[in-house]
Structures are given as C-alpha cells and as structure tokens.
C-alpha cells in the first residue's frame, strides 16, 4: 500500500468504511462536496470493498484517473494491504474518521459522536481534538440477535415496521406505574425498568418496540453518562441505527429529560466514510 499523494487538493478522494455488516463509500470533490453516498451489504471485506468501489465509480461516471486518493477505514480495513485498482490507498483511523465526518455533517465543533453500528463507540470532539472515550457492546447487532431469537427475523426494517404498531407501556415499567406523582426530575412517562412489564403473551409488535427502545435508550443513557463533567450537551448520532424511525421519539424524550441535544445529520450512516475521505484532506491518517 502506497503512501498518500502529497498534493491533497486535486481530484476526487474516495472514502470507504468497511464495516461488519455493510460497506459504505463516498466521494468528496475538490470543493468539499459529498458525492452520492452508497452502501452494500458486506459479505467478506475484500469482495465488498471492490464491489462497492467498482459500482460507485460506474454509477457516478467517475474514471480511475479522476481519483486522487482512496481512504479506507472500519474493522474490515485491516484486510486491505494493497492499492485498490492501482490507486494510492491509505488507512484512516476509524475514531478520527467518526469525528471528522460528524463535524462536517453537523457543523458542530464540540460534541460527542455516537457511532451506532453493530456495537456503539463514543468519540469526544473539541475542535481538532478528537478522542475515543469508550463505548458499549449494545448496538445494531444486539437488536438483530435478540430479534432473531424473539421474533424469528433479523431484518431490522421488518422489526421497525412491526414496532410502529407496538405499545411500549405493555413492555417497559414506567414511573407512572409505580408512583402516583412524577418524581424529582422524572416525569410519569419516563422508563423505570426496561421489559419489566412484559407478559408471556406479549405481541410481536410490542416485543419489537420493546427491543428497539431498549437498545436506543441504553445507547442514549451511556452517551449522557459519558458527557458528565465535560460540559458537552450536543450528541451527534451516526451509523446504521440512526435510520430507525423510532430514534426521533426516543431521543426527543431524552432531550427534554436531560436538557441535551441529539443530532442526526443528513448523511448520518455515511459519516465514517466521509470522515475517512476528509482525513486525507486534513492529512490526519495512518498509512499502514
């Protein structure tokens, strides 16, 4: 794998995020415009990367000569040790890519980036100071696995559709179930205990909404706890889980409860790939 070119402002930079379940690819032109983000389901990292790259170039009418640099990131980047289609190729640090992409898409300088993929990672950003501060094993993989066991499907779109007809009060124990009055700082609609109200004959729809709320609330609570003493009130959500329609209702409630702000940018699921490309423009990448 060659080092990145020394003239970083000519030609299109391609950013590729090779994840566990999906591979995402974007191009950024010399004006800094994101060009038609695209993703495919990952099979194995090499096949997914080359398949995504070839299809992206074809769909956008981009020639190999138009590409100045390819930047790869994500867990699958470890398998890439050669130039892609003979183009200069380098690796971007994933957590830096998370931060750069979220900053670009949100316009914020100070935030915690919540990368909601198979698991969840937390990255603190304060200007150019981008640092991984932790994470949780709860994420999209958790939702898929539990749905596989409890709903006999791991199709997240199907689970989200089922959840639209679900009643969360039949699954979660709420403050209003245990107290006649709101508690200090906790309205009666706040969750007291996840799944504590579930019955043996719970419907598929109620189970679906319960699973989604459990994952999203756990991620949200972890994020808020990670921000304590930092003064940060802005959290930028990126990754595939941000596509769940239930995100907005869960995080709107948490915003009111904790006086914080959850942001879901336009290209939320592509932020890491965008950040990988931007890391080349910023010269903040690893080449090996």
Specify the residue positions occupied by each region the protein language model found.
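Conserved phosphate-binding catalytic cores of ATP/NTP-utilizing and phosphoryl-transfer enzymes
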Residues: 1-8, 80-114, 119-129, 274-282
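Short glycine-rich, Thr/Ser-proximal phosphate-binding strand/loop in the N-terminal lobe
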Residues: 4, 8-51, 130
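Short glycine-aspartate micro-motif
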Residues: 13-17, 67-71, 111-115, 135
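Short beta-strand-loop/turn "lid" adjacent to the catalytic site in phosphate-handling enzymes
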Residues: 38-42, 53, 58-94, 127-132
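Glycine-rich phosphate-binding loops at beta-strand->alpha-helix junctions
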Residues: 72-78, 225-254, 269
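Glycine-rich phosphate-binding/hydrolytic loop that grips phosphoryl groups
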Residues: 100-105, 143-147, 260-288
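Glycine-rich phosphate-binding loop plus the immediately following alpha-helix
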Residues: 128-183
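Adenine-nucleotide phosphate-binding core of ATP-dependent small-molecule kinases
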Residues: 184-234
